[in-house]
């Protein structure tokens, strides 16, 4: 694994939690600027969710929810990853996603589920966030 020391290696990619709270779009831009090819994290199987959840529980300071790279760009429940990978796996918290009040189009890991399950949230909300990079 070529990941820097405080990054989590998984399936050839590296993941890191950033505690600084940002709106979803600012978080995605931060990941992209960190290094070419970086994005907010995408998930493709349950095992990844569990490994990430454990990593975040160990390293995340504070109770903030955590942005990941999934969003409903078209606002019609057609969820897309910012790294353009296939949306082949979803693990929503109960009764989610709900586009609550027609305003929630970005996806966060829910702290009350141990960061295992997802909720759609207002994109302007300030959250911690998870970047995914290749090194």
Swiss-Prot record:
PROSITE patterns: C_TYPE_LECTIN_1, C_TYPE_LECTIN_2. Expressed by the venom gland. GO terms for molecular function: carbohydrate binding; metal ion binding; toxin activity. It comes from the Eukaryota. Residues 10-132 form the C-type lectin domain. A motif (Galactose-binding) lies at residues 96-98. InterPro entries: C-type_lectin-like (IPR001304), C-type_lectin-like/link_sf (IPR016186), C-type_lectin/snaclec_domain (IPR050111), C-type_lectin_CS (IPR018378), CTDL_fold (IPR016187). Its main location: secreted. The keyword Metal-binding applies. CDD domains: CLECT_REG-1_like. Disulfide bonds join 3-14, 31-131, 38-133, 106-123. It is found in: Secreted. One of its GO terms (biological process) is heterophilic cell-cell adhesion via plasma membrane cell adhesion molecules. Ca(2+) binds at residues 96, 98, 104, 119-120. Keywords: Calcium, Disulfide bond, Hemagglutinin, Lectin, Metal-binding, Secreted. The keyword Metal-binding applies. SUPFAM superfamilies: C-type lectin-like. One of its GO terms (cellular component) is extracellular region. Belongs to the true venom lectin family. Homodimer; disulfide-linked. Galactose-binding protein which recognizes specific carbohydrate structures and agglutinates a variety of animal cells by binding to cell-surface glycoproteins and glycolipids. Is a calcium-dependent lectin. Shows high hemagglutinating activity, that is inhibited by lactose, galactose and inositol. This is C-type lectin LmsL.
């Amino acid at each position: 694994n070529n990941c820097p020391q405080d990054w989590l290696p998984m399936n050839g990619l590296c993941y890191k939690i950033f505690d600084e709270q940002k709106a979803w779009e600012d978080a995605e831009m931060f990941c992209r600027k960190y290094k070419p090819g970086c994005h907010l994290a995408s998930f493709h199987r349950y095992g990844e969710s569990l490994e990430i959840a454990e990593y975040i529980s160990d390293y995340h300071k504070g109770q903030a929810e955590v942005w990941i790279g999934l969003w409903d760009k078209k606002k019609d429940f057609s969820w897309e990853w910012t790294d353009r990978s296939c949306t082949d796996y979803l693990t929503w918290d109960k009764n989610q996603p709900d586009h609550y009040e027609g305003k929630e189009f970005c996806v966060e890991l829910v702290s009350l589920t141990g960061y295992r399950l997802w909720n759609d949230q207002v994109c302007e909300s300030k959250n911690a966030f998870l970047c995914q990079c290749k090194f």
